[in-house]
Swiss-Prot record:
Pathway: Cofactor biosynthesis; riboflavin biosynthesis; 2-hydroxy-3-oxobutyl phosphate from D-ribulose 5-phosphate: step 1/1; Cofactor biosynthesis; riboflavin biosynthesis; 5-amino-6-(D-ribitylamino)uracil from GTP: step 1/4. This is Riboflavin biosynthesis protein RibBA. The lineage of its organism: Bacteria, Bacillati, Bacillota, Bacilli, Bacillales. Keywords: GTP-binding, Hydrolase, Lyase, Magnesium, Manganese, Metal-binding, Multifunctional enzyme, Nucleotide-binding, Riboflavin biosynthesis, Zinc. It catalyses: D-ribulose 5-phosphate = (2S)-2-hydroxy-3-oxobutyl phosphate + formate + H(+); GTP + 4 H2O = 2,5-diamino-6-hydroxy-4-(5-phosphoribosylamino)-pyrimidine + formate + 2 phosphate + 3 H(+). It comes from Bacillus mycoides (strain KBAB4) (Bacillus weihenstephanensis). Residues 200-397 are annotated as: GTP cyclohydrolase II. Binds 2 divalent metal cations per subunit. Magnesium or manganese. Binds 1 zinc ion per subunit. Catalyzes the conversion of D-ribulose 5-phosphate to formate and 3,4-dihydroxy-2-butanone 4-phosphate.
Length: 397
C-alpha cells in the first residue's frame, strides 16, 4: 500500500512531489511534500489545485533566526503545537499569492544572501519551524519535510500542503491512495520515516566507562546517552565479548519498584539478579540496563497502572485504560548500543519473543533464547499469567 522511504527520496531528488501520511491517532491527514530547493511555480500550482490546503514551508530554527521570522503568536494553543512563524512575501512580489510569486518567495527564503528585510510581513507563505531531532522528537509533517530534505542532501526545508477532498472534507488514507494512483505519486508514512531514521542513523553516544564491582562480580560499566529521547542507559560487560561467538545478553528494562525496592508485584528484580549471576558464571556477557520504566510508560504511570490493577484490571488492561499500548518499548536504541559494543550474534536471556523480534529487526542475530523464569509468587501470579496469555511470554506456569 505504501512505498519505501528510499523510493520517495529518489522522487524528491528529481523535484517530484510525494504524499506523506501521519498517524491515525494524530491528525490522520496526508500532505503533499516537495523539497523547497527544487520548488517551481508548476509544483505550487499542483499543490493548491489538487491539495487545496495551506501551502507552508517547514524550515530549521537557523533559517528562522537568520531571517528574523518571529512566531506567529506568543502563546501557541494549537493541539499539536505547530510552530508557525509570521507569514511572508518576498519584496519583489506584487500580491504574493500567485503560484509564480509564492515559488519566488520560497526560493528567496532559501537564498543565503537574503535578509529579514527582504520579506514583507504578513504574506502568503507560511514558514513552520521544525523541532531539532525531526520526526524522532515530533511526528509531524513539518519535521517529516525537513528530515526528507536532509536525507536527500538538499537544503533543510520543504514545501507542504494538506490534501483536502473535492467536497471539502479531509482526505484519509483511502482517498490519499486514490490521489497517489491518479497522479503517480509515491506515498509514505511518518511512522515508516521514523523507523528508517532509527535504522540508519547512529543515535547513541558512548559517554563514560568505569570498573563496577558488584555482589555478583566485577563488570566493565559503559554509560550511554541517546539523541532520541535523551535517556541514559548503561551496559555491564563481563569478559572478552569480541571473539565473534554468540554472546550471552540480557536486555533489562528499568523497574525501580522491583529492581530497587524488591516489589513482589513483578519478577523484574529476581530476573536482574539472576541474569547478572548467570553472566558472571559464564565469564562473559552483557547486561544492558534500559531506562524504560513500566514497559516504557514511566514510573508515575506505572504506579497509576498498579492502582488500576488493585481495582481489578490486569497489567495490559491497565496500560490501555491509561491510553498506552500494552508495551511501549522500542528496541532500536538498545540494538545500537549492542552494536556499539561490537556484538552481532546473541544468546538472549528472555522469556519475551517480541524482544527477540525487536532486536532482530535491527540486524542482530539471536542464535538462542535462554529462558529466565523466576519462581512465581502469590502477589505476581496474575501478572505473569497475563504476560503469558496476552503478551506471548514463554512461561511455564
Amino acid at each position: 500500500m505504501f512505498h519505501r522511504i528510499e523510493e520517495a527520496l529518489e522522487d524528491l531528488k528529481q523535484g517530484k512531489v510525494v504524499i506523506v501520511c501521519d498517524d491515525e491517532n494524530r491528525e490522520n491527514e496526508g500532505d503533499f511534500i516537495a523539497l523547497a530547493e527544487y520548488i517551481t511555480p508548476e509544483t505550487i500550482n499542483f499543490m493548491i489545485t489538487h491539495g487545496r490546503g495551506l501551502v507552508c514551508v517547514p524550515i530549521t530554527e537557523e533559517y528562522a533566526e537568520r531571517l528574523q521570522l518571529e512566531p506567529m503568536v506568543s502563546h501557541n494553543t494549537d493541539s499539536h503545537h505547530t510552530a508557525f512563524t509570521v507569514s511572508i512575501d518576498h519584496v519583489s512580489t506584487t500580491t504574493g499569492i500567485s503560484a509564480h510569486e509564492r515559488a519566488t518567495t520560497i526560493q528567496e527564503l532559501l537564498n543565503p544572501a537574503s535578509k529579514g528585510s527582504d520579506f514583507n510581513r504578513p504574506g502568503h507563505i507560511f514558514p513552520l519551524i521544525a523541532k531539532e531531532g525531526g520526526v524522532l522528537r515530533r511526528a509531524g509533517h513539518t519535521e517529516a519535510a525537513v528530515d526528507l530534505a536532509k536525507l536527500c542532501g538538499a537544503e533543510p526545508a520543504g514545501v507542504i500542503c494538506e490534501i483536502i477532498n473535492e467536497d471539502g472534507t479531509m482526505a484519509r488514507v483511502p482517498d490519499l491512495l486514490e490521489c497517489a494512483k491518479q497522479f503517480d505519486i509515491k506515498m509514505i508514512t511518518i511512522e515508516d520515516l521514523i523507523a528508517y531514521r532509527r535504522h540508519h542513523e547512529t543515535l547513541v553516544t558512548r559517554e563514560v566507562e568505569i570498573t563496577l564491582p558488584t555482589d555478583f562480580g566485577t563488570f566493565h560499566a559503559i554509560g550511554y546517552s541517546n539523541s532520541l529521547d535523551m535517556k541514559e542507559h548503561i551496559a555491564l560487560v563481563k569478559g572478552d565479548i569480541s571473539t565473534g561467538e554468540p554472546v550471552l545478553v540480557r536486555v533489562h528494562s528499568e523497574c525501580l519498584t522491583g529492581d530497587v525496592f524488591g516489589s513482589c508485584r513483578c519478577d523484574c528484580g529476581p530476573q536482574l539478579h539472576a541474569a547478572l549471576a548467570q553472566i558472571e558464571r559464564e565469564g562473559k556477557g552483557v547486561l544492558l540496563y534500559m531506562r524504560q520504566e513500566g514497559r516504557g510508560i514511566g514510573l508515575l504511570n506505572k504506579l497509576r497502572a498498579y492502582k488500576l490493577q488493585e481495582e481489578g484490571l490486569d497489567t495490559v488492561e491497565a496500560n490501555e485504560k491509561l491510553g498506552f499500548p500494552a508495551d511501549l518499548r522500542d528496541y532500536g536504541i538498545g540494538a545500537q548500543i549492542l552494536k556499539d559494543l561490537g556484538l552481532q550474534s546473541l544468546r538472549l536471556l528472555t522469556n519475551n519473543p517480541r524482544k527477540i523480534a525487536g532486536l532482530q529487526g535491527y540486524d542482530l542475530e539471536v542464535t538462542e533464547r535462554v529462558p529466565l523464569q523466576m519462581p512465581t509468587k502469590e502477589e505476581n501470579k496474575t501478572y505473569l499469567q497475563t504476560k503469558a496469555s496476552k503478551l506471548g511470554h514463554l512461561l511455564n506456569l
